[in-house]
Amino acid sequence: MGNPFEGWPVHDIVYTVIVGLVMLAAVLEWFLWVAAFMYCLVKVFIKAEHWTIRALAVVVAILFVGFRAVFLPIMVVTLPLPSAIVKLWPEDMVVGLQWFAFWAFAGLLTIPWLFCVYHFVTNQLGREKRVKQVLDEVSAPKVVIVMPCYKEDPEVLLVAMNSIVDCDYPPSCIHVFLSFDGDQVDELYLNTIETFGVPLTLDSYPKSIDVTYKAARITISRFPHGGKRHCQKATFKLIDKVYKEYLERNDNLFILFIDSDCILDRVCLQNFIYDMELSPGNSRDMLAMTGVITSTTKKHSLITVLQDLEYIHGQLFERTVESGCGAVTCLPGALTMLRFSAFRRMAKYYFADKAEQCEDLFDFAKCHLGEDRWLTHLFMIGAKKRYQIQMCTSAFCKTEAVQTMQSLVKQRRRWFLGFITNEVCMLTDWRLWTRYPLLVLIRFMQNTIRTTALLFFIMVLAILTTSKRVSDLPVGFIAISLGLNWLMMIYFGAKLRRFKIWLYPLMFVLNPFFNWWYMVYGIFTAGQRTWGGPRADAAAADGDTTAQQAIEAAEKAGDDLNIVPETFIPAAQIKRKESGRRRIVAGGNIQPSAKIDGMFAIPERGANGWYQHDNISLFTVAHGHTGRVPLHPRDSFDSFLSAQTALNSVYIPRRVESIMGDEDRRKYELAQASQFNQFLSNQRRSTNGEPPQGQVYEYSDVDLQKAGYTDNPLPPTPGETASAVPAALNLHHKVGSTDSLVSLGSSASNSNQRDRGRQRTLMPPTSSQARTGRSPLGRASFLRTSTIEDIELEIGTSHGSSANRPALSRQASNNDPNNSNSGGHQQR
């Protein structure tokens, strides 16, 4: 038998051996991607609640396998193989397949590229300030920032907090909710409050306290440990309680979710608000936006550089394409801003404890590992029209890059499993096909050509081994796939002055190998768990261990897939049976419930000027006892853990001065003065020593009356004359933006000492006028400090007769020595 390589040049033999190995890797990747995608489609078909889901699962499966099968021969004939092999292919077949591949790839790469170009022509890219006028307490909407914290490094947490309060945004319009996932007073908690100027000489600390840090209000809370989602849920309950009355008068409250290790850019907040509220001609119906998350590191390496390139390309290219097609498909928890009035309508679905509804690993990957995508799917169904869930390319933040290869692989495995499960759920949702047809079509086609990037490496190898000349390669394919993307990355680097992203060809060559390893590792480990069963040491839920505790145990052990999700529902049923609750725990829906269709929307404003919320928020907390609202067993419900802590974990925040002695209060005031002076010096430095150009014109009595605002017809207390407006608003002078902070605080403090016993209510205009997004309440927060006596009276009132409740409430208000309006606990 003759030698098959007889007559072959040596370089062709070496090239063929190397290419053979790469082709085997590419074929393995091709097969695993098809197998994983089809497995998810089968799971969706089995779990489907509606016939349209099953029908779409069958159609998507047929088209997906068909397109993938076509690309197998294309991959073979496109590769620059030695001439001894190429001559075996029929010439007509080779030409036809190559032209089909060229136009298919050209369309799938060029059309999204044009969407990206259009986005940056019509929207601004970069960290430049977009708001032309100086924002003040009147013109700037209120922003509440939710930052959950769990065992974070104190220095990292302080940097994140400083990045928020140092933003170019009126401090009086910033309210940070720093929530610790754990109610113990530990070293991290004490170090944090000490940084904010709180003395560490107190005997005890309330569960929720208010401090002022660099002129911004910060509410520091400790909640029972239950995970990030539970911590955010408890924080939302607190926000909804504090701002309940404010939302009845205004629709200019926004909520920003960030992580405790994120560093906000200086103009991040105001650029978010510009796109959602303040831009010229804004219809003010934007519901959710995400920004640009970049990576930062103290020590550079190849891994960190590739992550930075991937972050920039994935967000500024892929997410802007999605944004141009109607909606982004992932709102990351690290940087997402939502319109609060619309979000509270979705809260009970957003914060539902999906871990207890997991039947298998598919549900666990969809709802836990890929919760950001799952929750974005909820919002896409909840929105009434396209272009309400968008990308803000001028709002930036930084997060720490993963430093080790082991951590990176586990992170990407988590991302991959969350991506593929939610991607299949989106492709089989008929509502998305009708509302976002172009977006879903592009997502589907991109999934069909996924895992073909290894071909470019083979082309480069052909040139390096001189097996082929450049003229023998598919130059058009290379020019489109690499050239267009590199051109865009060059523009990004020049615009952002981030020149290392010009190294995009490095990512283009190396990333296919990293992505290959992420996919193979993720599918094999998940497949081993699916078909081989859980390991003996896998974390399981039972009567003593909740689903969340089992998940945390697996993560602590270093493998978040080493769990037994099949035990989650039985464990939850045991818990509910022990608690006397008869509700049966069922598995979660494969698609968002039909109940939320169109629910993610702004409430209507009534003829009297008030916004009609209709008690739509599950977590709206009344001033007295709040009963639990039963939820649908499949759509959403509170976990047993949340149910036991819901009534004792949310407290009205107390001003920290109210729990201090005279000496501690004096020290705290000195610390506050030092912080405020530092804040003013930083403001002057940022404006080159010049005061802000904007002016704050306080409303006079006549102006308020012309606008339609009136006082409640409450009789004045003895020895006091009635005023047309609350004293905190009745400032008959105009001051600069910075000075208004000082004058507003001092005026409110002086007025509170005169008006301790009574608070007035500012009535909204009675005319039905267009929403302006501004209100005199935007300048200040009105607060009633909740003392122990208040809480006791409140609890007693909730169990007393309804006829006695108003009298008890007024008596508590009149007898409270700490009842003041300075700072903003209870919104009026």
Curated annotation (Swiss-Prot):
SUPFAM superfamilies: Nucleotide-diphospho-sugar transferases. Residues 740-752, 813-822 have a biased composition (Low complexity). Keywords: Glycoprotein, Glycosyltransferase, Membrane, Transferase, Transmembrane, Transmembrane helix, Virulence. Gene3D superfamilies: Spore Coat Polysaccharide Biosynthesis Protein SpsA, Chain A (3.90.550.10). Disruption phenotype: Does not affect vegetative growth. Does not significantly changes in the chitin content in vegetative hyphae, nor in conidia. Abolishes the ability to form appressoria on artificial surfaces, except following the application of the exogenous inducers 1,16-hexadecanediol and cyclic adenosine monophosphate. The appressoria formed have a reduced chitin content and are smaller and misshapen. Also reduces the ability to enter rice plants, but does not affect growth in planta. One of its GO terms (molecular function) is chitin synthase activity. One of its GO terms (biological process) is chitin biosynthetic process. Its main location: membrane. It comes from the Eukaryota. Its EC number is 2.4.1.16. One of its GO terms (cellular component) is membrane. Induction: Transcription is regulated by the CON7 transcription factor. Expression is strongly induced on germination of spores and during appressoria maturation. Residues 740-780, 793-828 are annotated as: Disordered. The chain crosses the membrane at residues 17-37, 57-77, 95-115, 444-464, 473-493, 501-521. It is found in: Membrane. Belongs to the chitin synthase family. Class VII subfamily. This is Chitin synthase 7. The lineage of its organism: Eukaryota, Fungi, Dikarya, Ascomycota, Pezizomycotina.
